[in-house]
Amino acid sequence: MKRHFFSGKIIASPSLFLLICTAFIFAQLAHAQVSSKKEEKLDFNIPKDTYFNNAVHPKGTGKSFFNFGDILVARAILPAASFSEGPSSGQYIGSGLINQQPVPFLNKQPIQGFSAIVNNYDGTFIALSDNGFGSIENSSDYNLRLYRIKPKFKTFFLSGNGTIETKGFIELRDPNNLIPFAITNHFSESRVLTGADFDIESVQRTKNGDYWIGDEFGPFLLHFDKDGILLDPPIPLPDYENPGKELRAKQNPFSEESSALRIMNAMRAHAKTNGSKSPVMSPWFVMLDDNNENTSVNSRENPPAGLKKASSELHNVSSLNKAGHQVVVYTVNDLENMNLLLELGVQGIISDRPDILLEAVQNFDKNKDGQPDYIDANGLIDVNIFDAQGHRGSRNLRPENTLPAMEAALDFLMPTLETDCGITLDGVPILDHDPHIEASKTRKADGTTYEFDDEVLVKDLTFDQIQKTFIADKILNGRPAQTNDLTLSPVAVAFAKQNELIDPYVMPSLQQLFDFVSFYIEYYKNGPGSTTNQASKRWKNASKVRFNIETKINPRTDTDDRGDIFSDRTVDPETFTKAIADVIVANNLTDRADIQSFDFRTLLIAHKQYPEIRTVCLFGDFPKVGDAGDGTNLQDQNGQNTPWLAGLYWPYRNTSQETPFRIKSSGGFEGMALSTDGTKLLPLLEKSLEGSSSNSLLIHEFDLENKKYNGNSFDYPLNEKASAIGDFIMFSNTRGLIIERDGSQGDLNGFKAIYEIQLDQNKRQIEKRLNVDLLKINDRRKISLPGLEGDIGIGKDFAFPFVTIESVVVFNPFLIGVLNDNNYPFSVGRHVGTGLPDDNEFILLWLDQPLGRRWRNPKGIKNETMVNDIKAYPNTFDEQVTFSNISKGNDVSITIYDISGAVVKKLLVHEKSTDASSFIWNATNDLNQKVSQGIYIAIIEIDGVFTKKKLIKK
C-alpha cells in the first residue's frame, strides 16, 4: 500500500498542522475523483453511530483516506490490573506472581478478557468478559458478567485521556434451574454462572433487550434477559452430517468425560458456602482417562443386555488437579498399576494390599534424585503429599473391616485407614460394608447355621446383639493372601482381651476403631511391641493416622435381589451422617477423619451440619442388571437421572464412543453475528472440525423466533496463516466482518487481520476480502505514545500484537472499533520490555477502504446522482453556500463540520430531493448563530453514497 509522509521541520501550531493535513487530504481526494467519476453505493444498513461520527474526527462520515492506510484515530485503555467487586478469584491458576501480578485475587474479580462487544449508541458499550482464566479447569471462581464500559478516547486531535471507565455489570445467572447439568453454584439460590460452566465468547442483543451468548464448551447458545437471567435451557448445536447427533466439544456436559469435573465443582462450592473443606474425588481407578488399554470396566466394554457399550476413559487426573481437586483412586492391588498411577500423578491410592502399596510408595522417585518422593524424614508416608489407604483395613490380607484388618494396615504404615459403616438399631456406627450381615463373611459365635436366607439387616439389630452374635473371620474365595491367623494380629488379640470382646474378629464399632488405634500406639510405644524392629515407625504413624469412613447407604427406590427396596435397607441419610459425624467430633478427630460416600446426600448434610469434617466423593459404575447389582452410583434409575448424586446430572454411558468430540478444544462459538433484520443469529465456530481436511469453519443459521437452527450453514475459509477467528458481525444483509488471528503475541510479523465477508444464501462458501491488517496501522498523530519501556507496536507504525483479538464494532462505513482480549494475567503482547500483562485496549480505525464497497461491477444498476457532479458554490463564501445538481428522488443528508471535527450544522437529514433540487447553507450553526471565518467541511450523503466539499468562510 502506497504511503505518503511529510518531511521538513516540525509544525508547532496544531491548527496549522490540520490546515496542511486537510489540504493534503483533499489533494488526494481530488486525485481519486478524477480516476473514478461515479461511485458505488455502499452495502451498509446498520444504524450509524452519530456519537462517534460527531466526536472523533473531521472526516465525519465522509470519504476514506485512500492510499493513506488504515488510520488510528482514537485509543482508550483499561489497565490490566482492573478489578470489580466479587468473590476471590484466580485460586486455581497458581500462587505468588504471574507476570508480576500477585495471585490469587482476594475478594475481587478482574475486569478482563473482553470477548465481544455491543454498542449502546450513547458512548457506552456492553463488553462480554470471557470465562476467566482460559480453561474449564481454572475458572470456577470467575463469575460470568457483561460489563458496561465508557471509553474516554484519546483522539486524533489528542483530546480525551485515553481511559476506559466501568459503569457496572450484569451478572449471568440461572435462578430458575433451566440448566439441566451440574454448574459450580448448582446448590445456591441465585446460581451465578462461572467460567467453569460456560466459555462465553460472543454476544448479540436483540430488539427486546435480550442477550444471546455463544459458548465454546458445548457449544451452546445461551439466552438471557436484560438483567442476566437465563431464559431457556442451553441450546446445543445439531450435527447435520450425522442426523440425531450433536456437534460437541470435549467439555460438553452431556458426555461423561467432563461431568465429574462439573460435579466436583458443584460439591466444592456447596462445601465452601457452608464453611467446609474442599471435597476429595475418589474414582474407581479403571475409569481414569489414562490411555491404558488394560484398565477398563468389563460391563462397559462388554455390556449385558439393557446397557450401552461405553468408554471407560472418563476421569482425567491432570484436568481435575488443575481445577484444584485431589484425586484418590480405589481399589488398586498390583504393583504395576500402582506404579502407573504414581506416574500419572494421583494424590492417593486405596488398596486391599497395603504391603504392596507401601513398597510402591517407598520406591517411587519420579524426580530421580535418589530419594523417594513421598517418604518423610521418619521413613513414613507423608500424607500431606500422598495418601496411601488400607481398603477396609487390608481386605486381601485379613477379613475386611475388622480390627485385625486395621492392624495389618497400620503394620504396613498406611497413613489412612479406609472403612465402611452401617448404623445399628440403637444408632451405633459399626464397621460393615453391606446392609445385611453377610453369611459369606460372618459366622455365628454359637456355631448355629447362618446362611444367605438367614441374613439380617444391620439396622434391625442393636450393637450389643451384633457383637455377641457374629464373628467376621471367614476367608473369601479369590483372595489367596487373606488369612485369619490370630498370631499375625497380636494387638487385636490384646485389645479384645482387655475389652472383653468375644473374639478379635467381632464387628467393631467406629468408636472401637478409634480406641483400637490409641491402643495400638501404646502397644508399640510403651507396651509389648516396643522392642520390635518397626515399633517406632508404627506408633508414630498410628499417632497421626487418618480415617476415611464411608456411609454405606443406597438411595435407589427399586428392589434388590431379595425384593427389598434399596433405600429401606438402612437408616435415612441424615441419621446415617449424624451418627458417624458425632463419633468423629466426640473423639476430636475432625481434622483426621473424612466422611466418604457414593450417596452425595450424606455429603451435603455433612457440609451443612459438620463443616469441620472433610468429605470424599466416590464415583463408580456397578450397574444393576435385572436382580443383580445395586446401581452404584452413576447408573440411571428407570430412565431418570441417578439418585446417588443429590440431583446432580450424570449422562450415564454417553461418551465419545457414541458421540465423538468433533469440535476442537476452544473451537466453539467464538464469533456470532446478528442479521441486520434481527431475525437470525449466525454463530461461527472458532476452528475447523476434528478430522476436517480443509481449514474451513462452520457458520450455522439460528432462527430467533422459533429458537431453532434452520439447517442452513456456510463454510468460512480461514487463512492458512490463521489458527482461529476472533469475532464475526454483520453490517448489512450480506456483508460482515470477521477477525482472524494466529497464536502469536508480541510478534510484528504475526498474523492479525480483519476480513470483510460476503454471505450469499445460494452459496455454501463465503467470499472474503482483506480489509485491515491489524499489525500495520497508521498512527500519524502518535496517539499511542507514550508507552512503557520496550513496548512494541506503538508510535507511527501502530500494531495490535495480541494473541487474542476478539471484538470488532462498526460505527459507519469508514469507522470501526477493535478490542483485544488481554487474557489477564497471562498474555504479554504489548509490554514485552517490562514483561507486564497486556491491558484491554479499545482502538478506533478510519478505514482506507470503506465497508460495503462493491467487489465487482454489478449489472443493471439504475441511474443515480453522480455525487462528484454535485456543486457547492461559492466554496469561498461570505453569506451562504448553495449545493446543487441533485437529481429528483434522492435521499439527501448534508452535515457541516468545522476543522476540529465538531458538527456545526445538520443542514439536511434524509430529505427527498425534488426536480433540480438545490439546498442553501446560510453560514449559521444549529443555534442559528453566524459562524466565524475558517475552513469547514460539508459531508454529503446521497442514497448512501458519500462525498465531501471543502468550504472557506472569509
For the regions a language model picked out, list residue spans one by one.
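Bacterial N-terminal signal peptides
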Residues: S15-A27
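Sequence/structural signature of beta-propeller domains
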Residues: Q33-S255, S259, T273-S276, Q640-N857
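C-terminal tail/sorting-segment detector
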Residues: I920, Q929-K954
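N-terminal secretory signal peptides that target proteins for export/translocation
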Residues: M1-A12
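Surface-exposed, proline-anchored Ser/Thr-rich loop/turn motifs
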Residues: P858-K888, I896-A902, Q933, K950-K954
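Phosphate-group recognition and catalysis centered on beta-loop-alpha active-site segments
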Residues: K245, F254-A646, P651, T655
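A glycine-anchored, Pro-Gly-centered beta-turn/N-cap motif
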Residues: N890, D915, S932-I935
